[in-house]
Amino acid sequence: MPIDNLPPLREVIDTYGLQAHKSLGQNFLFDLNLTSKIAHQAGTIEGKPVLEIGPGPGGLTRALLAKGAIVTAIERDERCIPALLEIEKHYPNQLKLICNDALKQDFSKLFGSSPEKPRIIANLPYNIGTQLLLNWLLVEPWPPFYESMTLMFQREVAKRITAKPQSSHYGRLSVLTGWRTIAKIAFDVPPQAFIPAPKVTSSVVHIIPRAQPLVCSAQKLSLITKTAFGQRRKMLRQNLKTLGGEIILEKAGIDGTRRAETLSISEFVTLANLIT
């Protein structure tokens, strides 16, 4: 069933000759039950500002608008703009389109004067999803410009985002996410929900910023985690040589023969605060 008398998404794709481009990391989400489920996962959004990245032909966009959200959608692919403009006509004053590369967008400036923080809700393009998340996790000042994030990733990336110490998926992304936010996998999305169908399962991750994360420089924590996990099978005293190695490990009371995947987030914060 189409939403609010708009054409079915398959018809939109045919009308505008839209095909997902692998180079842009595109996989169009067609299942309207799933788009509604993603929108619902973000909580009550009626009358609330929402930021969507990579709307494509507008499947998730329509679900967000149908729930009353005020959507700012950033789309790099100019081919999709005419289809999105048709949706904009149907929802006057509810949808703002920006044709831009999300990696180059100044989000703080975009929402700086807004009285209410946006919720970021998106089926992120696979090729920029992780980098966008890192940018949003390391943004300054903190608390950030957004209220929450409800994002689609490949299942393996979602596991890395939410992983705990001592697990194979635990790494830099897990530490940076857990430091500043509380993240959980909400539900999985099968490949057949997309066109074209990816080879892997996807997962929707819900992320809420912590009001007061452990005190630490984002830049230093980013550096220490990148260095520590650079060669994850090596001992910390070897991986951290360029950052003071055994000296900072001794000051932190951390055994230099441990591996990065055994450290808690608070231990990484302690190490980061010792970098000069």
Swiss-Prot record:
GO MF annotations, alphabetized:
16S rRNA (adenine(1518)-N(6)/adenine(1519)-N(6))-dimethyltransferase activity; RNA binding
Task: Provide the residue positions that the database annotates as binding S-adenosyl-L-methionine.
Answer: N27, L29, G54, E75, D101, N123
Q: Which keywords does this Swiss-Prot/TrEMBL entry list?
A: Cytoplasm, Methyltransferase, RNA-binding, rRNA processing, S-adenosyl-L-methionine, Transferase
Localization terms from the record: Cytoplasm
**Gene Ontology annotations for the cellular component aspect, listed alphabetically:** cytosol
**Gene3D superfamilies (UniProt xref):** Ribosomal RNA adenine dimethylase-like, domain 2, Vaccinia Virus protein VP39
The record, for SUPFAM superfamilies, names: S-adenosyl-L-methionine-dependent methyltransferases
Q: Which domain of life is it from?
A: Bacteria
Query: What SMART domains would the database entry show?
Result: rADc
Task: Name the Pfam families for this protein.
Answer: RrnaAD (PF00398)
Look at the named UniProt entry and state the broad enzyme category this protein falls under.
transferase
Chemical reaction(s) catalysed: adenosine(1518)/adenosine(1519) in 16S rRNA + 4 S-adenosyl-L-methionine = N(6)-dimethyladenosine(1518)/N(6)-dimethyladenosine(1519) in 16S rRNA + 4 S-adenosyl-L-homocysteine + 4 H(+)
Reported EC number(s) for this entry are 2.1.1.182
Query: What's the stated role of this polypeptide?
Result: Specifically dimethylates two adjacent adenosines (A1518 and A1519) in the loop of a conserved hairpin near the 3'-end of 16S rRNA in the 30S particle. May play a critical role in biogenesis of 30S subunits.
State the similarity comment. Belongs to the class I-like SAM-binding methyltransferase superfamily. rRNA adenine N(6)-methyltransferase family. RsmA subfamily.
Query: What is the protein's given name?
Result: Ribosomal RNA small subunit methyltransferase A
Originating species: Bartonella tribocorum (strain CIP 105476 / IBS 506)
**Which classification does the entry list for the species?**
Bacteria, Pseudomonadati, Pseudomonadota, Alphaproteobacteria, Hyphomicrobiales
